[in-house]
Design a protein with these regions (language model features):
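Short, cationic-aromatic polyanion-contact patches
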Residues: 88-106
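Eukaryotic, polar/proline-rich low-complexity intrinsically disordered regions
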Residues: 2-6, 42, 46, 105-106
Length: 106
């Protein structure tokens, strides 16, 4: 599936990337999620921006993790309800996330 301008979705992890992420510890995954959530706000932000900033912050602590995996972690956080999304999360350049909005009291 392509976007209107022919953009392909984010590719799956290749073998080397899959091997790298399979070695991440639970603590590293928690740190990655913490940093991703810290980059989010109550206004929608591009997933690519959040991913890029998180990579920059964690490169010294958790090196060689591909951006595609960070985007997968963002999708995971959306599934857990820790982030809200708009757009197709399979296209990190064309999707946005934010922290959950407080639901109004009825």
């Amino acid at each position: 599936m392509h976007t209107a301008d022919g953009e392909l979705p984010d590719p799956p992890l290749d073998v080397a990337q899959s091997l790298r992420v399979s070695k991440l510890t639970q603590g590293e995954l928690q740190e990655m999620d913490r940093v991703l959530l810290a980059q989010a706000s109550h206004s929608f932000r591009k997933v690519a921006r959040i991913v890029g900033t998180a990579i920059g912050e964690l490169q010294g602590k958790i090196p060689d993790v591909p951006d595609i995996y960070y985007a997968q972690r963002v999708r995971h956080l959306v599934e857990l309800g820790k982030l809200e999304s708009q757009g197709n999360l399979r296209y990190m350049r064309f999707s946005e996330v934010r922290l959950p909005q407080a639901s109004p009291l009825s």
